[in-house]
């Protein structure tokens, strides 16, 4: 552990001598500018999909709040027939719990946990 501390201090001192403070400030500014440019280009690309202004400096607190987002309604229509899951005997709506049956008297027994159902012929 002590060897690690000595190594870290040595590397820090070496970097301080190799890169004076003025160079570190300019490197830091260049890094910040490149990161901001990268983020702005990503936001520009994402903004082209959303159709909104995307550069980082154009955003306000109102743009970033979720209250202003529009909530979409995904509830299915009540009696809309889904052709993928429908037959002439049974029509299942797009809702998970709604099922409309016609022209059938089939009863399906579903066993509960711990209550096995013996098949009846």
UniProtKB/Swiss-Prot annotation:
Tissue: Kidney, submaxillary gland, urine.
Keyword line: Secreted, Signal
Main location: secreted
Organism superkingdom: Eukaryota
Induction of the gene: By androgens.
Pfam families, alphabetized: KAR
Subcellular location(s) of the protein: Secreted
GO cellular component entries: extracellular region
Signal peptide coordinates: 1-18
Designated name of the protein: Kidney androgen-regulated protein
Organism: Mus musculus
Gene: Kap
């Amino acid at each position: 552990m002590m060897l690690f501390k000595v190594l870290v201090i040595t590397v820090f001192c070496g970097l301080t001598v190799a890169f004076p403070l003025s160079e570190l400030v300019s490197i830091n500014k260049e890094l910040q500018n490149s990161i901001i440019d990268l983020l702005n280009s990503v936001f520009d690309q994402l903004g082209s999909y959303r159709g909104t202004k995307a550069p980082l400096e154009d955003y306000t607190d109102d743009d970033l709040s979720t209250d202003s987002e529009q909530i979409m309604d995904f509830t299915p229509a009540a009696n809309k027939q889904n052709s993928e899951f429908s037959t002439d005997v049974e029509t299942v709506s797009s809702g998970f719990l709604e099922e409309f049956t016609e022209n059938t008297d089939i009863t399906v027994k579903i066993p509960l946990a711990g209550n096995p159902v013996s098949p009846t012929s």
